[in-house]
Swiss-Prot record:
This is ETS translocation variant 3. Residues 158-184 have a biased composition (Polar residues). Its main location: nucleus. The keyword Ubl conjugation applies. Gene3D superfamilies: Winged helix-like DNA-binding domain superfamily/Winged helix DNA-binding domain (1.10.10.10). InterPro entries: Ets_dom, ETS_fam, WH-like_DNA-bd_sf, WH_DNA-bd_sf. The gene is ETV3. It comes from Gorilla gorilla gorilla. Belongs to the ETS family.
Length: 512
Protein backbone atom coordinates (compact mmCIF):
# COMPACT_ATOMS: atom_id res chain seq x y z
CA UNK A 1 0.00 0.00 0.00
CA UNK A 2 1.37 3.39 -1.03
CA UNK A 3 2.08 5.89 1.67
CA UNK A 4 -0.54 8.60 2.09
CA UNK A 5 -3.16 6.68 0.14
CA UNK A 6 -5.70 5.05 2.37
CA UNK A 7 -7.56 2.71 0.08
CA UNK A 8 -10.99 1.64 1.24
CA UNK A 9 -10.87 -1.91 2.42
CA UNK A 10 -12.40 -4.54 0.21
CA UNK A 11 -15.83 -5.36 1.61
CA UNK A 12 -16.16 -8.68 3.23
CA UNK A 13 -19.02 -11.05 2.57
CA UNK A 14 -21.28 -8.88 4.70
CA UNK A 15 -22.22 -6.22 2.16
CA UNK A 16 -21.42 -3.47 -0.30
CA UNK A 17 -20.45 -3.68 -3.93
CA UNK A 18 -17.71 -6.18 -4.54
CA UNK A 19 -15.81 -4.96 -7.57
CA UNK A 20 -13.28 -7.14 -9.36
CA UNK A 21 -9.92 -7.66 -7.73
CA UNK A 22 -8.15 -5.29 -10.09
CA UNK A 23 -10.18 -2.42 -8.62
CA UNK A 24 -8.50 -2.91 -5.25
CA UNK A 25 -4.92 -3.65 -6.25
CA UNK A 26 -2.72 -2.10 -3.60
CA UNK A 27 0.25 -2.11 -5.95
CA UNK A 28 -1.51 0.28 -8.33
CA UNK A 29 0.28 3.60 -8.65
CA UNK A 30 -1.16 6.79 -7.15
CA UNK A 31 -3.63 8.48 -9.48
CA UNK A 32 -4.21 5.32 -11.45
CA UNK A 33 -7.58 4.77 -13.04
CA UNK A 34 -8.14 1.31 -11.68
CA UNK A 35 -11.25 2.54 -9.86
CA UNK A 36 -13.58 4.98 -11.56
CA UNK A 37 -15.54 7.75 -9.93
CA UNK A 38 -18.92 6.22 -10.47
CA UNK A 39 -17.66 2.98 -8.87
CA UNK A 40 -16.61 5.02 -5.89
CA UNK A 41 -19.97 6.82 -5.69
CA UNK A 42 -21.85 3.53 -5.73
CA UNK A 43 -19.52 2.27 -3.04
CA UNK A 44 -20.27 5.26 -0.82
CA UNK A 45 -23.99 4.91 -1.42
CA UNK A 46 -23.88 1.33 -0.15
CA UNK A 47 -22.07 2.19 3.07
CA UNK A 48 -24.09 3.18 6.09
CA UNK A 49 -21.37 5.39 7.56
CA UNK A 50 -21.46 7.77 4.55
CA UNK A 51 -25.21 8.28 4.63
CA UNK A 52 -24.76 11.85 5.87
CA UNK A 53 -22.42 12.59 2.96
CA UNK A 54 -24.19 11.00 0.01
CA UNK A 55 -27.48 9.08 -0.09
CA UNK A 56 -30.10 7.76 -2.42
CA UNK A 57 -32.90 10.19 -3.18
CA UNK A 58 -36.25 8.94 -1.98
CA UNK A 59 -38.89 8.33 -4.62
CA UNK A 60 -36.66 8.39 -7.69
CA UNK A 61 -35.13 5.24 -9.04
CA UNK A 62 -31.34 5.52 -9.32
CA UNK A 63 -31.21 9.13 -8.12
CA UNK A 64 -28.82 10.22 -5.38
CA UNK A 65 -27.99 13.50 -3.70
CA UNK A 66 -24.56 14.65 -2.55
CA UNK A 67 -25.26 16.17 0.85
CA UNK A 68 -21.67 17.24 1.55
CA UNK A 69 -19.88 17.91 -1.75
CA UNK A 70 -16.58 18.91 -0.12
CA UNK A 71 -16.47 15.72 1.94
CA UNK A 72 -17.21 13.57 -1.10
CA UNK A 73 -14.43 15.35 -2.99
CA UNK A 74 -12.06 14.83 -0.06
CA UNK A 75 -12.87 11.12 0.11
CA UNK A 76 -12.37 10.77 -3.63
CA UNK A 77 -9.06 12.65 -3.45
CA UNK A 78 -7.89 10.40 -0.65
CA UNK A 79 -8.87 7.33 -2.64
CA UNK A 80 -7.01 8.54 -5.72
CA UNK A 81 -4.09 9.97 -3.73
CA UNK A 82 -4.87 13.52 -4.86
CA UNK A 83 -5.11 15.77 -1.81
CA UNK A 84 -5.87 18.86 -3.92
CA UNK A 85 -9.16 17.35 -5.12
CA UNK A 86 -12.21 19.62 -4.75
CA UNK A 87 -15.82 19.53 -5.85
CA UNK A 88 -15.16 21.60 -8.97
CA UNK A 89 -12.82 18.95 -10.29
CA UNK A 90 -15.14 16.17 -9.19
CA UNK A 91 -18.12 17.78 -10.92
CA UNK A 92 -16.11 18.02 -14.13
CA UNK A 93 -15.48 14.31 -13.86
CA UNK A 94 -19.19 13.75 -13.36
CA UNK A 95 -19.96 15.83 -16.45
CA UNK A 96 -17.74 13.46 -18.39
CA UNK A 97 -20.24 10.73 -17.54
CA UNK A 98 -23.04 12.74 -19.14
CA UNK A 99 -21.63 12.01 -22.58
CA UNK A 100 -21.02 8.41 -21.62
CA UNK A 101 -24.67 8.26 -20.56
CA UNK A 102 -23.75 6.64 -17.28
CA UNK A 103 -25.45 9.32 -15.20
CA UNK A 104 -26.95 12.77 -15.65
CA UNK A 105 -27.70 15.82 -13.56
CA UNK A 106 -31.21 16.20 -12.24
CA UNK A 107 -32.57 19.56 -13.33
CA UNK A 108 -33.82 21.88 -10.65
CA UNK A 109 -32.05 20.08 -7.80
CA UNK A 110 -28.62 20.97 -6.48
CA UNK A 111 -26.00 18.25 -6.12
CA UNK A 112 -28.50 15.68 -7.34
CA UNK A 113 -27.62 13.13 -10.00
CA UNK A 114 -29.30 10.10 -11.43
CA UNK A 115 -27.78 6.90 -12.76
CA UNK A 116 -28.97 5.80 -16.17
CA UNK A 117 -29.71 2.22 -15.27
CA UNK A 118 -31.43 1.77 -18.61
CA UNK A 119 -27.89 1.73 -19.96
CA UNK A 120 -27.20 -1.20 -17.64
CA UNK A 121 -24.22 0.25 -15.91
CA UNK A 122 -23.53 -2.51 -13.43
CA UNK A 123 -23.19 -5.43 -15.84
CA UNK A 124 -19.99 -3.85 -17.04
CA UNK A 125 -18.65 -6.02 -14.26
CA UNK A 126 -20.55 -9.29 -14.48
CA UNK A 127 -19.30 -10.74 -11.21
CA UNK A 128 -20.56 -8.04 -8.87
CA UNK A 129 -22.09 -9.53 -5.76
CA UNK A 130 -24.62 -7.57 -3.73
CA UNK A 131 -25.62 -8.30 -0.18
CA UNK A 132 -27.54 -5.57 1.55
CA UNK A 133 -26.16 -4.58 4.90
CA UNK A 134 -28.46 -2.17 6.61
CA UNK A 135 -31.30 -0.05 5.34
CA UNK A 136 -31.29 0.79 1.64
CA UNK A 137 -34.10 2.90 0.15
CA UNK A 138 -36.13 1.69 -2.75
CA UNK A 139 -34.26 3.90 -5.19
CA UNK A 140 -31.15 1.78 -4.73
CA UNK A 141 -30.43 -0.30 -7.81
CA UNK A 142 -31.22 -4.00 -7.70
CA UNK A 143 -28.46 -6.08 -9.20
CA UNK A 144 -28.90 -9.78 -9.96
CA UNK A 145 -26.28 -12.29 -8.98
CA UNK A 146 -25.64 -15.84 -10.00
CA UNK A 147 -26.29 -17.12 -6.49
CA UNK A 148 -29.73 -15.62 -5.92
CA UNK A 149 -33.18 -15.97 -7.41
CA UNK A 150 -35.59 -13.17 -8.06
CA UNK A 151 -39.34 -13.55 -8.12
CA UNK A 152 -41.82 -10.94 -9.17
CA UNK A 153 -45.52 -10.67 -8.35
CA UNK A 154 -48.03 -11.50 -11.08
CA UNK A 155 -50.09 -9.07 -13.09
CA UNK A 156 -53.35 -8.85 -11.20
CA UNK A 157 -55.65 -6.19 -9.81
CA UNK A 158 -54.73 -6.99 -6.21
CA UNK A 159 -51.08 -6.04 -6.58
CA UNK A 160 -49.67 -4.25 -3.53
CA UNK A 161 -48.73 -1.23 -5.67
CA UNK A 162 -51.23 0.83 -7.61
CA UNK A 163 -48.89 3.00 -9.64
CA UNK A 164 -48.74 1.89 -13.25
CA UNK A 165 -46.05 4.34 -14.24
CA UNK A 166 -42.70 2.56 -14.09
CA UNK A 167 -39.85 4.10 -12.24
CA UNK A 168 -42.26 5.81 -9.84
CA UNK A 169 -43.67 4.78 -6.53
CA UNK A 170 -47.15 4.90 -5.09
CA UNK A 171 -47.94 6.69 -1.88
CA UNK A 172 -47.94 3.49 0.11
CA UNK A 173 -44.51 2.48 -1.10
CA UNK A 174 -43.11 5.94 -0.38
CA UNK A 175 -44.41 5.93 3.16
CA UNK A 176 -43.06 2.44 3.64
CA UNK A 177 -39.65 3.55 2.44
CA UNK A 178 -39.78 6.51 4.79
CA UNK A 179 -40.41 4.18 7.70
CA UNK A 180 -37.58 1.94 6.56
CA UNK A 181 -35.05 4.72 6.83
CA UNK A 182 -35.84 5.07 10.52
CA UNK A 183 -36.17 1.41 11.42
CA UNK A 184 -34.37 -1.36 9.59
CA UNK A 185 -36.42 -4.19 11.02
CA UNK A 186 -39.69 -2.87 9.64
CA UNK A 187 -38.41 -3.50 6.16
CA UNK A 188 -37.84 -7.20 6.72
CA UNK A 189 -41.17 -7.59 8.46
CA UNK A 190 -43.01 -5.93 5.64
CA UNK A 191 -41.22 -8.06 3.09
CA UNK A 192 -42.05 -11.25 4.91
CA UNK A 193 -45.70 -10.21 4.94
CA UNK A 194 -45.49 -9.53 1.25
CA UNK A 195 -44.05 -12.98 0.75
CA UNK A 196 -46.87 -14.59 2.70
CA UNK A 197 -49.71 -12.44 1.43
CA UNK A 198 -49.60 -11.42 -2.18
CA UNK A 199 -47.08 -13.85 -3.65
CA UNK A 200 -48.70 -17.19 -2.84
CA UNK A 201 -49.52 -18.12 -6.41
CA UNK A 202 -46.23 -17.23 -8.06
CA UNK A 203 -44.27 -19.17 -5.48
CA UNK A 204 -45.84 -22.42 -6.66
CA UNK A 205 -43.56 -24.61 -8.71
CA UNK A 206 -40.44 -22.66 -7.69
CA UNK A 207 -37.54 -23.91 -5.64
CA UNK A 208 -38.58 -23.54 -1.99
CA UNK A 209 -35.03 -22.62 -1.05
CA UNK A 210 -35.29 -19.40 -3.01
CA UNK A 211 -37.69 -17.74 -0.59
CA UNK A 212 -35.45 -18.63 2.31
CA UNK A 213 -32.46 -17.13 0.55
CA UNK A 214 -34.43 -14.04 -0.39
CA UNK A 215 -35.73 -13.31 3.12
CA UNK A 216 -33.05 -14.74 5.36
CA UNK A 217 -30.15 -13.25 3.43
CA UNK A 218 -31.95 -10.04 2.64
CA UNK A 219 -31.68 -10.84 -1.05
CA UNK A 220 -34.73 -8.87 -2.00
CA UNK A 221 -34.38 -6.34 0.75
CA UNK A 222 -32.62 -3.97 -1.61
CA UNK A 223 -34.90 -4.69 -4.50
CA UNK A 224 -37.39 -2.19 -5.77
CA UNK A 225 -40.93 -3.48 -5.87
CA UNK A 226 -41.98 -3.53 -9.49
CA UNK A 227 -45.27 -1.95 -10.61
CA UNK A 228 -48.14 -4.03 -11.86
CA UNK A 229 -47.07 -3.75 -15.45
CA UNK A 230 -43.77 -5.50 -14.87
CA UNK A 231 -43.81 -9.02 -16.25
CA UNK A 232 -41.26 -11.71 -16.98
CA UNK A 233 -39.40 -11.49 -20.23
CA UNK A 234 -38.61 -15.02 -21.31
CA UNK A 235 -41.93 -16.55 -22.23
CA UNK A 236 -41.19 -19.66 -24.20
CA UNK A 237 -38.72 -22.38 -23.26
CA UNK A 238 -36.47 -23.87 -25.86
CA UNK A 239 -36.19 -20.63 -27.75
CA UNK A 240 -32.40 -20.61 -27.58
CA UNK A 241 -31.12 -24.11 -28.24
CA UNK A 242 -27.85 -22.67 -29.54
CA UNK A 243 -25.08 -23.22 -26.93
CA UNK A 244 -23.58 -19.87 -27.93
CA UNK A 245 -26.79 -18.04 -27.15
CA UNK A 246 -26.58 -15.43 -24.38
CA UNK A 247 -29.60 -17.00 -22.68
CA UNK A 248 -30.06 -20.51 -21.45
CA UNK A 249 -33.31 -22.40 -21.75
CA UNK A 250 -35.55 -21.50 -18.87
CA UNK A 251 -36.55 -24.49 -16.70
CA UNK A 252 -39.99 -22.98 -16.11
CA UNK A 253 -42.56 -23.63 -18.82
CA UNK A 254 -43.61 -20.39 -20.41
CA UNK A 255 -47.05 -19.29 -21.47
CA UNK A 256 -47.95 -17.76 -24.77
CA UNK A 257 -48.28 -14.05 -25.00
CA UNK A 258 -48.59 -11.19 -27.41
CA UNK A 259 -44.86 -10.98 -27.90
CA UNK A 260 -43.65 -14.53 -27.75
CA UNK A 261 -40.12 -13.96 -28.93
CA UNK A 262 -37.90 -13.18 -25.95
CA UNK A 263 -35.93 -10.00 -26.20
CA UNK A 264 -32.85 -9.32 -24.16
CA UNK A 265 -33.13 -6.42 -21.73
CA UNK A 266 -29.70 -5.49 -23.02
CA UNK A 267 -31.35 -4.48 -26.28
CA UNK A 268 -33.03 -1.14 -26.70
CA UNK A 269 -35.71 -2.76 -28.82
CA UNK A 270 -37.51 -3.69 -25.63
CA UNK A 271 -40.40 -1.22 -25.20
CA UNK A 272 -39.55 1.81 -23.12
CA UNK A 273 -42.84 2.07 -21.25
CA UNK A 274 -41.22 0.53 -18.22
CA UNK A 275 -38.03 1.32 -16.40
CA UNK A 276 -34.87 -0.51 -17.32
CA UNK A 277 -32.64 -1.78 -14.59
CA UNK A 278 -29.68 -4.09 -14.26
CA UNK A 279 -31.96 -6.55 -12.59
CA UNK A 280 -33.72 -9.10 -14.82
CA UNK A 281 -35.55 -7.02 -17.39
CA UNK A 282 -39.25 -7.65 -17.62
CA UNK A 283 -41.43 -7.18 -20.65
CA UNK A 284 -45.03 -5.96 -20.29
CA UNK A 285 -46.07 -8.05 -23.26
CA UNK A 286 -45.75 -11.51 -21.77
CA UNK A 287 -48.21 -13.00 -19.37
CA UNK A 288 -46.11 -15.48 -17.42
CA UNK A 289 -46.62 -15.15 -13.72
CA UNK A 290 -43.31 -16.46 -12.40
CA UNK A 291 -39.69 -15.84 -13.16
CA UNK A 292 -36.45 -17.18 -11.77
CA UNK A 293 -32.81 -17.47 -12.68
CA UNK A 294 -30.58 -20.42 -12.34
CA UNK A 295 -26.84 -19.71 -12.12
CA UNK A 296 -26.24 -20.62 -15.74
CA UNK A 297 -29.00 -18.32 -16.92
CA UNK A 298 -27.65 -15.48 -14.85
CA UNK A 299 -24.17 -15.96 -16.21
CA UNK A 300 -25.42 -15.64 -19.78
CA UNK A 301 -27.65 -12.77 -18.79
CA UNK A 302 -24.90 -10.71 -17.22
CA UNK A 303 -22.59 -11.42 -20.11
CA UNK A 304 -25.13 -10.19 -22.62
CA UNK A 305 -25.75 -7.03 -20.63
CA UNK A 306 -22.04 -6.39 -20.36
CA UNK A 307 -21.78 -6.64 -24.13
CA UNK A 308 -24.61 -4.16 -24.41
CA UNK A 309 -22.85 -1.62 -22.21
CA UNK A 310 -19.62 -2.02 -24.13
CA UNK A 311 -21.57 -1.24 -27.29
CA UNK A 312 -23.59 1.61 -25.80
CA UNK A 313 -22.52 3.98 -28.57
CA UNK A 314 -24.26 1.92 -31.21
CA UNK A 315 -27.61 2.86 -32.65
CA UNK A 316 -30.61 2.11 -30.39
CA UNK A 317 -31.94 -0.30 -33.01
CA UNK A 318 -28.74 -2.26 -33.55
CA UNK A 319 -28.41 -5.78 -32.21
CA UNK A 320 -25.34 -7.38 -30.69
CA UNK A 321 -24.03 -10.20 -32.80
CA UNK A 322 -25.48 -13.17 -30.96
CA UNK A 323 -25.77 -16.33 -33.06
CA UNK A 324 -28.97 -17.56 -31.47
CA UNK A 325 -30.76 -14.25 -31.12
CA UNK A 326 -34.13 -14.24 -32.80
CA UNK A 327 -35.50 -10.89 -33.86
CA UNK A 328 -39.26 -10.55 -33.41
CA UNK A 329 -41.25 -9.85 -36.56
CA UNK A 330 -42.52 -6.36 -37.16
CA UNK A 331 -46.05 -5.67 -36.03
CA UNK A 332 -47.07 -4.02 -39.30
CA UNK A 333 -46.21 -6.84 -41.65
CA UNK A 334 -47.78 -6.49 -45.08
CA UNK A 335 -50.03 -9.17 -46.44
CA UNK A 336 -48.55 -11.20 -49.28
CA UNK A 337 -51.05 -9.89 -51.80
CA UNK A 338 -50.31 -6.31 -50.79
CA UNK A 339 -46.58 -6.74 -51.01
CA UNK A 340 -46.73 -8.17 -54.51
CA UNK A 341 -48.62 -5.25 -56.02
CA UNK A 342 -45.47 -3.17 -56.06
CA UNK A 343 -43.49 -5.67 -58.10
CA UNK A 344 -42.32 -4.51 -61.51
CA UNK A 345 -44.26 -6.14 -64.30
CA UNK A 346 -42.41 -6.39 -67.59
CA UNK A 347 -44.63 -5.75 -70.60
CA UNK A 348 -43.82 -6.85 -74.14
CA UNK A 349 -42.32 -4.05 -76.21
CA UNK A 350 -44.68 -2.18 -78.53
CA UNK A 351 -44.86 -3.20 -82.13
CA UNK A 352 -42.04 -1.51 -83.99
CA UNK A 353 -42.33 0.51 -87.15
CA UNK A 354 -41.05 -2.39 -89.20
CA UNK A 355 -43.67 -4.78 -87.83
CA UNK A 356 -46.44 -2.22 -88.26
CA UNK A 357 -45.44 -1.67 -91.89
CA UNK A 358 -45.42 -5.42 -92.41
CA UNK A 359 -48.94 -5.82 -91.00
CA UNK A 360 -50.30 -2.88 -92.97
CA UNK A 361 -48.63 -3.99 -96.19
CA UNK A 362 -50.16 -7.45 -95.93
CA UNK A 363 -53.59 -5.84 -95.76
CA UNK A 364 -52.99 -3.40 -98.59
CA UNK A 365 -51.09 -5.71 -100.94
CA UNK A 366 -54.26 -6.95 -102.69
CA UNK A 367 -55.30 -3.79 -104.61
CA UNK A 368 -51.71 -2.76 -105.32
CA UNK A 369 -49.99 -4.45 -108.25
CA UNK A 370 -46.67 -6.18 -107.82
CA UNK A 371 -44.75 -4.22 -110.48
CA UNK A 372 -45.79 -0.98 -108.85
CA UNK A 373 -44.28 -2.01 -105.52
CA UNK A 374 -41.30 -3.64 -107.14
CA UNK A 375 -40.41 -0.47 -108.95
CA UNK A 376 -39.26 1.27 -105.74
CA UNK A 377 -35.53 0.50 -105.42
CA UNK A 378 -33.43 0.88 -102.28
CA UNK A 379 -32.45 4.39 -101.42
CA UNK A 380 -28.95 4.86 -102.81
CA UNK A 381 -27.00 8.08 -102.87
CA UNK A 382 -26.33 9.18 -106.47
CA UNK A 383 -24.09 12.03 -107.51
CA UNK A 384 -25.75 14.91 -109.38
CA UNK A 385 -25.85 14.69 -113.17
CA UNK A 386 -23.84 17.86 -113.64
CA UNK A 387 -20.74 16.17 -112.27
CA UNK A 388 -20.90 13.22 -114.67
CA UNK A 389 -20.23 12.90 -118.36
CA UNK A 390 -22.96 11.66 -120.72
CA UNK A 391 -21.31 8.25 -121.12
CA UNK A 392 -21.43 7.45 -117.43
CA UNK A 393 -24.99 8.69 -117.31
CA UNK A 394 -26.00 6.23 -120.01
CA UNK A 395 -24.35 3.32 -118.15
CA UNK A 396 -26.06 4.21 -114.91
CA UNK A 397 -29.39 4.44 -116.70
CA UNK A 398 -28.97 0.95 -118.15
CA UNK A 399 -28.01 -0.50 -114.76
CA UNK A 400 -31.07 1.05 -113.19
CA UNK A 401 -33.33 -0.42 -115.84
CA UNK A 402 -31.90 -3.89 -115.32
CA UNK A 403 -32.17 -3.48 -111.57
CA UNK A 404 -35.82 -2.55 -111.74
CA UNK A 405 -36.60 -5.46 -114.06
CA UNK A 406 -34.91 -7.93 -111.72
CA UNK A 407 -36.73 -6.53 -108.72
CA UNK A 408 -40.04 -7.04 -110.46
CA UNK A 409 -39.83 -10.76 -109.74
CA UNK A 410 -39.18 -10.31 -106.02
CA UNK A 411 -42.22 -11.08 -103.83
CA UNK A 412 -44.14 -8.09 -102.59
CA UNK A 413 -43.55 -8.95 -98.92
CA UNK A 414 -39.79 -8.87 -99.30
CA UNK A 415 -39.90 -5.55 -101.11
CA UNK A 416 -42.23 -4.14 -98.50
CA UNK A 417 -39.83 -5.20 -95.72
CA UNK A 418 -36.96 -3.61 -97.58
CA UNK A 419 -38.96 -0.47 -98.06
CA UNK A 420 -39.84 -0.38 -94.36
CA UNK A 421 -36.24 -0.66 -93.29
CA UNK A 422 -35.03 2.06 -95.63
CA UNK A 423 -37.63 4.77 -95.30
CA UNK A 424 -41.20 4.60 -94.14
CA UNK A 425 -43.50 7.20 -95.62
CA UNK A 426 -47.02 7.06 -97.02
CA UNK A 427 -47.39 6.41 -100.69
CA UNK A 428 -48.06 9.45 -102.84
CA UNK A 429 -51.58 9.63 -104.25
CA UNK A 430 -51.80 9.45 -108.05
CA UNK A 431 -52.42 12.66 -109.98
CA UNK A 432 -55.02 11.12 -112.30
CA UNK A 433 -57.05 8.58 -110.34
CA UNK A 434 -58.84 7.22 -113.39
CA UNK A 435 -55.68 6.52 -115.35
CA UNK A 436 -53.06 4.19 -113.81
CA UNK A 437 -49.63 5.72 -114.08
CA UNK A 438 -46.20 4.35 -113.61
CA UNK A 439 -44.27 4.96 -110.42
CA UNK A 440 -41.85 7.84 -110.04
CA UNK A 441 -38.86 5.56 -110.39
CA UNK A 442 -39.76 4.72 -114.00
CA UNK A 443 -40.17 8.28 -115.17
CA UNK A 444 -36.55 9.39 -114.90
CA UNK A 445 -35.52 6.21 -116.69
CA UNK A 446 -37.70 7.06 -119.69
CA UNK A 447 -36.26 10.52 -119.73
CA UNK A 448 -32.79 9.04 -119.90
CA UNK A 449 -33.84 6.93 -122.87
CA UNK A 450 -35.16 10.04 -124.51
CA UNK A 451 -31.90 11.74 -123.73
CA UNK A 452 -29.99 9.06 -125.60
CA UNK A 453 -31.80 10.08 -128.80
CA UNK A 454 -30.63 13.64 -128.25
CA UNK A 455 -26.97 13.41 -127.27
CA UNK A 456 -26.36 17.13 -127.72
CA UNK A 457 -28.61 17.99 -124.79
CA UNK A 458 -27.46 17.35 -121.23
CA UNK A 459 -30.01 15.03 -119.71
CA UNK A 460 -31.61 15.98 -116.40
CA UNK A 461 -33.04 12.54 -115.60
CA UNK A 462 -30.40 10.88 -113.37
CA UNK A 463 -29.94 13.84 -111.06
CA UNK A 464 -30.32 12.32 -107.65
CA UNK A 465 -32.05 9.21 -106.54
CA UNK A 466 -34.03 11.36 -104.13
CA UNK A 467 -35.76 12.93 -107.13
CA UNK A 468 -37.03 9.53 -108.16
CA UNK A 469 -38.66 9.11 -104.77
CA UNK A 470 -40.32 12.52 -104.55
CA UNK A 471 -43.93 12.99 -105.73
CA UNK A 472 -44.42 13.70 -109.43
CA UNK A 473 -45.97 17.10 -108.81
CA UNK A 474 -43.01 18.31 -106.79
CA UNK A 475 -40.54 16.89 -109.28
CA UNK A 476 -42.38 18.61 -112.15
CA UNK A 477 -42.28 21.90 -110.29
CA UNK A 478 -38.56 21.58 -109.63
CA UNK A 479 -37.81 20.76 -113.26
CA UNK A 480 -40.03 23.59 -114.43
CA UNK A 481 -38.01 26.05 -112.37
CA UNK A 482 -34.57 24.62 -113.22
CA UNK A 483 -34.78 23.48 -116.86
CA UNK A 484 -35.83 26.04 -119.50
CA UNK A 485 -35.90 23.33 -122.16
CA UNK A 486 -38.53 21.44 -120.19
CA UNK A 487 -40.78 24.45 -120.48
CA UNK A 488 -40.44 24.45 -124.27
CA UNK A 489 -41.14 20.73 -124.37
CA UNK A 490 -44.22 21.17 -122.23
CA UNK A 491 -45.47 23.95 -124.50
CA UNK A 492 -45.06 21.71 -127.54
CA UNK A 493 -46.80 18.80 -125.72
CA UNK A 494 -43.67 16.67 -125.41
CA UNK A 495 -42.94 16.58 -121.67
CA UNK A 496 -41.85 13.52 -119.80
CA UNK A 497 -44.01 11.08 -121.65
CA UNK A 498 -41.84 10.59 -124.76
CA UNK A 499 -43.67 13.34 -126.62
CA UNK A 500 -46.84 11.32 -126.80
CA UNK A 501 -48.95 13.33 -124.40
CA UNK A 502 -51.77 11.52 -122.65
CA UNK A 503 -51.83 8.83 -125.29
CA UNK A 504 -48.20 8.01 -124.60
CA UNK A 505 -48.95 7.90 -120.91
CA UNK A 506 -51.69 5.35 -121.41
CA UNK A 507 -49.45 3.28 -123.70
CA UNK A 508 -46.62 3.33 -121.17
CA UNK A 509 -48.99 2.22 -118.44
CA UNK A 510 -50.26 -0.61 -120.62
CA UNK A 511 -46.71 -1.74 -121.36
CA UNK A 512 -45.89 -1.72 -117.71
Amino acid sequence: MKAGCSIVEKPEGGGGYQFPDWAYKTESSPGSRQIQLWHFILELLQKEEFRHVIAWQQGEYGEFVIKDPDEVARLWGRRKCKPQMNYDKLSRALRYYYNKRILHKTKGKRFTYKFNFNKLVMPNYPFINIRSSGVVPQSAPPVPTASSRFHFPPLDTHSPTNDVQPGRFSASSLTASGQESSNGTDRKTELSELEDGSAADWRRGVDPMSSRNAIGGGGIGHQKRKPDIMLPLFARPGMYPDPHSPFAVSPIPGRGGVLNVPISPALSLTPTIFSYSPSPGLSPFTNSSCFSFNPEEMKHYLHSQACSVFNYHLSPRTFPRYPGLMVPPLQCQMHPEESTQFSIKLQPPPVGRKNRERVESSEESAPVTTPTMASIPPRIKVEPASEKDPESLRQSAREKEEHTQEEGTVPSRTIEEEKGTIFARPAAPPIWPSVPISTPSEEPLEVTEDSEDRPGKEPSAPEKKEDALMPPKLRLKRRWNDDPEARELSKSGKFLWNGSGPQGLATAAADA
